[in-house]
Amino acid sequence: MPRPIQPLPRWADPDVPAGSLDPQGLSRRGLLRSAGLFGATFAGGAAFAGGALLAPTPAEAHTPASGDPNLVYLVGDHHVHSVYSHDAKYTFSQLAGAASRYGLDWMVFTEHSNIGHARAGGAEAEHREILKARADNKRMLIFQGLEWYIPGAEHCTVFSPPGRHEAELLTRFEQAYDGKLLGYTAGGPDHPDTPRNEAHAVKALQWLDQQRRCGYVDDVLVLANHPLRLGIDSPHEMRAWRDAAPGIMIGMEGAPGAQAGAFPGWAGPNSIRGEYVNKPSENSWPGYPAAAYVTYGGFDWATATVGGLWDAMLAEGRLFSITTNSDVHRVAYDTWKNGDWLPGQNFDNIGRLPDPVNTAEPQPGGDFWPGQFSRTHVGVTRYGYRDVMAGLRAGRVWVDHGQLIDGIDVRVNREHGIGRGVTLGGRLRVRRGEKIVLNVTVTTASRHNHHGEVPRLAHLDVIRGAVHGPVADRDEWRAPDTRVVHTADVEGRAGRYTLRIPVGKAEESFYLRLRGSDGKRNGPGFLGAAIDPHGPIPHEPGNGDPWLDTWCYTNPVFVDVVH
């Protein structure tokens, strides 16, 4: 007999009257209804019990949805820090409360690996607080994760669903494979330790894959965080991580957190959105241009550059997803400060910071609360921890800043194909010469965002890239056959509308992805106007109000031409 395990979010719960929902909740319930999933269907096909969904059987939990599913997109953040990170500030209750207030359905606490976290009981104490946070926030999916220091490279989110070994997995992984704890930090091309460190990162991902395969944990996922911030995640490393565990290492942050870090007059004259204020170092990969070290419309250069690193990986015909998150440590203009240590205490010997205390003065910080500005939307057919992870693995993901739109549904199909077609992360198999059509349904913002404005989408770009298979040069970061092929001017359009865009005949395998913005700041892309005529551009240092430059991106849909 299945048992109730997870109450639904208020906007999805039929027991919650529509009149009690805020505008965001009403909009999301409308999207749920339009997908035909409002009610028992969204709860895994079982009955409700007081607003709680009933646990699917193990077989149901592993059964993938069809290639043409009705999807609802859950809003989340996989990069959140609490007092269990040495450089953060907030308690679990503060962060979960903010996430609920700003409309998140799921979140991952990702504490930094650290001596105190790994060896002074921080991880175990953190797990007890995770359990309490779940009990106090029953309508939210709260994962325990880790921000892994990749040997010889940057950071990654690592997380698994609730289970008997969720905390133990992270502790074992941290102690055996963390680059910071092991001293495996060198990554420069000429450093003698670099080959060992890069190999250890691959072994780490393979170990996680094995824990999933043997059933030690039900699932585990890894995503690279702020990949170009320091220029130390080389293209060959990112490909090696992907190939080491394709179902585990699934993507990267397309846009970093710290998006509030460059408000004019706040963080200093050299500040950049995302805190991308670095220069190449001895550990940086020398093939990246200087322009790679700043953000573009808040997005990492690897994602924002049409024909750049993300496209070069997609052009191999392999899915590699993007996300966007808060990376919250210290919220801009917030008045809380770190509490004082008791005599003899420090992070290394107790594994956490003192609880913060409120003041009357704004404290330093460059972040937003989870869900306040950055959102990762994951397509699911029902509500649950493993469903979110399955949606991420399948690539059913789109991201936005500033609540730019309420929803987007992307379908690629033959011109006269049956059904609605393949959606984000999926693959459409066609014969050479078949005509392809792209259908995009946009639901515009129906309410004020968290800056007090109703966002307006100005344009939607279709980006197309040829698929050529594996690259000969594992450090190749260009995809020369990728470019913007269509721009839809949607200025002034409101409500829900569908764009039907003919793509032409499929002569070779390719992929499509979408990008849109509020239209306030754009210019020729990094690789030229012929490839990207109006892409995101960097802001002047110290003058990066994020609410005045908001974008949305989707994951790709692949079209595989068979002969």
Model-derived features with residue positions:
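N-terminal secretory signal peptides
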Residues: M1-G30, G44-A46, A52-L54
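C-terminal functional module detector
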Residues: I5-G19, H62-Y73, S85, F92-L95, ...
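Sec-dependent signal peptide hydrophobic core
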Residues: A35-A43
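Boundary at the C-terminal end of the N-terminal hydrophobic targeting segment
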Residues: A49, A59-A61
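A metal-dependent hydrolase metal-coordination microenvironment
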Residues: H62-R239, T303-T305, N325-V328, G523-G525, ...
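Substrate-binding cleft/loops of secretory-pathway carbohydrate-active enzymes
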Residues: V158-S160, R229-M249, R330-N349
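Acidic, His- and aromatic-enriched active-site or binding-groove loops in soluble protein domains
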Residues: R164-Q175, W241-Q259, P343-P362, H377-T381
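A solvent-exposed, charged loop/short amphipathic helix patch at secondary-structure junctions
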Residues: F173-H191, G265-T295
